[in-house]
């Protein structure tokens, strides 16, 4: 099964949206295989956002993402990277469809509630940045027989 990395950002944590995010993914049929609640250390922020470090918006992004705790998760399921991106909505909440997480809960691109990996390759990289292999738990949901053909 495919895996993806999701992170409820500080604004989502402060607004009490962790449970809402988990509920949406569980009800869709995906399973969480790892999670952690923490304030991200600078070194890991630099590694996670390595492609943005030289961009002019990075100092603000770094200040925001380290301003409070985040809730980090690894989810598993068929086509989860694409489906999770659809569930999350457009990066800019102004263009996010109603019914998506950002469409329902975010107003500003700089505080858009949640991060989700944009490809399988990115997911694998981000999972490795934030979790050790032994922190990922494999199990079978009791309802998997009703989720997949």
Swiss-Prot record:
User: If you read the UniProt record, what top EC class would you report for this enzyme, in one word?
Assistant: transferase
| CDD domains, per the entry | NDPk_I
Pfam families named in the record: NDK
Q: Which residues form the active site?
A: 115 (pros-phosphohistidine intermediate)
Q: Where does ATP bind?
A: 9, 57, 85, 91, 102, 112
Gene Ontology terms: biological process: CTP biosynthetic process; GTP biosynthetic process; UTP biosynthetic process
Q: What does this protein do?
A: Major role in the synthesis of nucleoside triphosphates other than ATP. The ATP gamma phosphate is transferred to the NDP beta phosphate via a ping-pong mechanism, using a phosphorylated active-site intermediate.
List, alphabetically, the PANTHER family matched: NUCLEOSIDE DIPHOSPHATE KINASE
Name of the molecule in the record: Nucleoside diphosphate kinase
Q: Provide the species name.
A: Methanospirillum hungatei JF-1 (strain ATCC 27890 / DSM 864 / NBRC 100397 / JF-1)
């Amino acid at each position: 099964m495919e895996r993806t990395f999701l992170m409820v950002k500080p604004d989502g944590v402060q607004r009490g949206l962790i449970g809402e995010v988990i509920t949406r993914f569980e009800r869709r049929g995906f399973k969480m295989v790892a999670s952690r609640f923490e304030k991200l250390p600078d070194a890991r922020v630099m590694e996670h956002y390595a492609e943005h470090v030289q961009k002019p918006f990075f100092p603000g992004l770094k200040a925001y993402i380290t301003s409070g705790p985040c809730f980090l998760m690894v989810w598993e399921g068929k086509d989860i990277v694409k489906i999770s991106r659809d569930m999350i909505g457009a990066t800019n909440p102004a263009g996010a469809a109603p019914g998506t997480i950002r469409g329902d809960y975010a107003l500003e691109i700089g505080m858009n509630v949640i991060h989700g990996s944009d490809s399988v390759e990115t997911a694998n990289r981000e999972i490795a940045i934030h979790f050790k292999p032994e922190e990922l738990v494999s199990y079978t949901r009791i309802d998997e027989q009703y989720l997949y053909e």
